[in-house]
Amino acid sequence: MAGYQEERDGSEHSVSILFTRSAGEQAPVTAQLALLPDELGNKTAEIILNGQSLGTIQNFSEEGNAKLSEKQTTELLTALKGNASIEVVFGEFKEKVSDKGAAAAMLKMDEFQQRLNTPSALIRQGQEKHAVLAQQAAPKIEAVSVNNRQTTELKRGEKQFDAVLALLRKSNGTNEDAENYCYELHKDDVWNKQITLYPLTKGKVLAQAICSSSAYNYTNYYAVLDGKLSKVEQVLENRYNYADYDKNTHILKIEGSFKARGLGDCWHGQEAVWNGKTFILTKEYPSGSCKGFPGGAWGPLPTFVSELKVK
């Protein structure tokens, strides 16, 4: 659960507080504070809760993050159950952190972790003894290493480029209202000037071409072809814009990373790997709200993770 500076007219200085709790009955809640490094001044900050100081925070990382004490965390959580006035003083600045929706977010945390009406709940505490959500191992996903990792670039004007492009366009269809339709793929312009072929296993090939582009994002069109480049066997969702082989495991990974706005302070993305038959999702994440932190206040906040098993 992450909170950010309160929106107001005029200049805002980026502030975020992140509360984290693992699954498990005895799992504690930890909290971190994030500020922009250039605004930290003497590398210390102070939290003012309902007019009272919670003490000085030090030991900020180079990224501008610092862990709060157990006492500071507990007092903030207690106050956020109702109306809380939270101010952070740092350098020459003072910024108010919004408490809107905090109680509802904590209730959602309790509900997801099956803590409602138990002693470990944050909001709706009770004496029920039922089990809460236990920690679970990340799902194991198989990926295969690729022996031949020599990519091929097909250039516009080459006979093979034209043939493969025709296959890709046919596989993408002609319905411009379709969710997976790629406008740039069907245009003969500067964006659509090369196709990259990545060898897979069992004689198959991954083809990469441009799909769409905007002011600050682009997607690629990815399709699995047979080794003779005569037919498209699989088409991937338009969620990716990068492919490469891992230098250590030699697996082929595709990634998608996208800004929510041009400032680049909020992102979302996902990753997938070739398992010998298809590409399977291995990671998915947002980065939180758009609040002025380059890359997001906390970087990727995964909603899905996995453990890779390479064959």
PLM ranges: what are they?
Residues 1-182, 194-197, 201, 281:
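A generic "folded-domain core" signal
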Residues 171-183, 221-236, 273-280:
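Surface-exposed loop/turn elements that mediate protein-protein interactions on large endomembrane-trafficking
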Residues 24-25, 50-52, 82-83, 199-205, ...:
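Short, solvent-exposed coil/turn segments at beta-strand boundaries
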Residues 4-5, 33, 207-212, 255-261:
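Short beta-strand segments that buttress and anchor functional surface loops
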Residues 233-311:
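Short aromatic loop motif centered on NTY/YTY
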Residues 195-214:
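Exposed beta-strand-loop-beta-strand "reactive/processing" segments of non-cytosolic proteins
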Residues 161-184, 287-307:
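Surface-exposed loop and turn segments in beta-propeller and other repeat-based domains
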Residues 215-223, 264-271:
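Structural motif
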